A protein has these predicted regions:
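Short, well-ordered loop/turn elements at secondary-structure boundaries
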Residues: 55-58, 100-102, 151-154, 160-161
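Long, low-complexity, intrinsically disordered segments enriched in glycines and aromatic residues
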Residues: 121-179, 185-190
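A structural signal for short, well-ordered beta-strand segments and their strand-loop junctions
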Residues: 62-63, 80, 106-107, 156-159, ...
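Short, charged surface segments at domain edges that flank catalytic/cofactor-binding sites
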Residues: 6-63, 90-91, 95-99
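C-terminal, charged low-complexity interaction regions
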Residues: 167-265
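Active-site cores of enzymes that catalyze phosphoryl transfer or operate on phosphate-rich substrates
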Residues: 2
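Histidine-centered nuclease catalytic patch
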Residues: 66-130
Length: 265
């Protein structure tokens, strides 16, 4: 999870909310008597909102930072809109969470879609290995886990190349005034150490290690090797996408990575 800098609210979302302030996000499958239009009735409206979220997030899952793939040949996108505060949990006087732009994120499918693109890497047969919004469900975790919109620019995580495991960098976390226990709950509640995600992170770490090894063999110092790799990979591509598992690369390349990063992240 990294900081997300939100862009301007999509036009169709703003127009719909202004005209239908109490509208539901989607039709309740149990309620066949629903009267009125829901947000998801219009595919163009949903797609515009999802695309703006993908742009804002550099096409990374708001929780695990895996890249968001679009499906081809009938496969499902590994991408969907998530409500940080459950859209169904609205108390008297609260905003309509379903249509609140500040409450919307875009995430991967968390491993629970068998027809997702690249299922061999992105689908899990064991529900205990699901992650991100799947485990979060309708739980109100606003005061329990971090909201990526409120994170600092600093990387508060550390990773282990031998396993791909994510842990809390307590020193950085405390220096940023963040609650270490809340950071650990974030990992736990979103199951960010799902074996599926750990394998993907380990692959990124192994690739970085191989790149560094090649440069060391060519005579470069470790600092120069890390700096040149950071300049090459720690940036958005032409489509505006960050590299998958951005924080993993940032951590592994250390101080040399920080010198290559351009704000905002």
């Amino acid at each position: 999870m990294k900081i997300i800098n939100k862009g301007v609210e999509p036009n169709r979302l703003g127009v719909f909310r202004a005209a239908n302030p109490d509208a539901l996000w989607d039709k309740d499958k149990k309620d066949n008597e629903l009267i009125g239009e829901t947000f998801r009735c219009c595919g163009a409206r949903y797609q515009e909102t999802q695309q703006q979220l993908r742009t804002d997030q550099g096409n990374l899952c708001a929780y695990c930072e895996q890249d968001l793939l679009s499906g081809t040949n009938g496969a499902l996108d590994d991408c969907r809109i998530e409500h940080f505060h459950p859209k169904s949990k609205r108390e008297q006087g609260e905003p309509n969470w379903g249509l609140d732009w500040a409450n919307l994120l875009v995430v991967c499918c968390g491993g629970n879609q068998s027809k997702v693109v690249a299922p061999e890497k992105r689908f899990d047969t064991d529900p205990e290995n699901y992650s991100c919004d799947v485990l979060k469900g309708d739980k109100i975790l606003d005061a329990i886990i971090f909201n990526p919109l409120n994170l600092p620019d600093a990387n508060i995580w550390k990773f282990y190349r031998s396993t791909g495991l994510i842990d809390v960098n307590e020193t950085v976390c405390e220096a940023q005034g963040l609650d270490v226990k809340m950071a650990r709950r974030t990992i736990k509640e979103l199951n960010l150490n799902s074996p599926r995600i750990m394998r993907a992170r380990k692959a990124v770490l192994d690739n970085l290690n191989n790149l560094i090894t090649e440069k060391l063999r060519s005579g470069q110092t470790i600092e120069l090797a890390r700096r040149s790799i950071a300049a090459s990979v720690l940036r958005k591509n032409k489509a505006g996408d960050w590299p998958s598992f951005f924080s993993v690369t940032r951590f592994y390349l250390g101080q040399q990575a920080e010198g290559s990063l351009v704000q905002p992240l």
